[in-house]
């Protein structure tokens, strides 16, 4: 098990909380909570050691396209592919953007 942390610049706080995915399914779960301070902080707990560069590249690609909301994101990963990670992350961001 490895715990990784990342920070990215962000805009306005997320509107609400969100949960996407289920780590028990052999996938991953993304938990998102609004945060203040113009920063997006991400903590990843993964079963795959040495995967930090892969996560960094994935997040850089996702957040290069648009301004992320200020939030705290926790990801519990059980070896999900980058495509699934992006899907769950986008689902959580969309859910958190709704009133």
UniProtKB/Swiss-Prot annotation:
O-(phosphoribosyl dephospho-coenzyme A)serine carried by residues: 25
Keyword vocabulary terms for this entry: Cytoplasm, Phosphoprotein
Keyword Cytoplasm: yes
Post-translational modification: Covalently binds the prosthetic group of malonate decarboxylase.
Molecular function (Gene Ontology), one example: acyl carrier activity
Subcellular locations according to the entry: Cytoplasm
Its biological purpose: Subunit of malonate decarboxylase, it is an acyl carrier protein to which acetyl and malonyl thioester residues are bound via a 2'-(5''-phosphoribosyl)-3'-dephospho-CoA prosthetic group and turn over during the catalytic mechanism.
UniProt-recorded name of the protein: Malonate decarboxylase acyl carrier protein
Organism: Pseudomonas aeruginosa (strain ATCC 15692 / DSM 22644 / CIP 104116 / JCM 14847 / LMG 12228 / 1C / PRS 101 / PAO1)
């Amino acid at each position: 098990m490895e715990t990784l942390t990342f920070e990215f610049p962000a805009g306005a706080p997320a509107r609400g909380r969100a949960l996407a995915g289920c780590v028990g399914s052999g996938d991953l779960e993304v938990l998102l909570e609004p945060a203040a301070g113009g920063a997006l902080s991400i903590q990843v707990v993964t079963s795959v050691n040495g995967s930090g560069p892969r996560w960094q590249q994935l997040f850089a690609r996702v957040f290069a396209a648009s301004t992320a909301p200020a939030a705290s994101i926790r990801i519990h990963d059980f070896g999900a592919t980058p495509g699934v990670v992006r899907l769950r992350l986008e689902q959580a961001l969309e859910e958190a953007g709704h009133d």
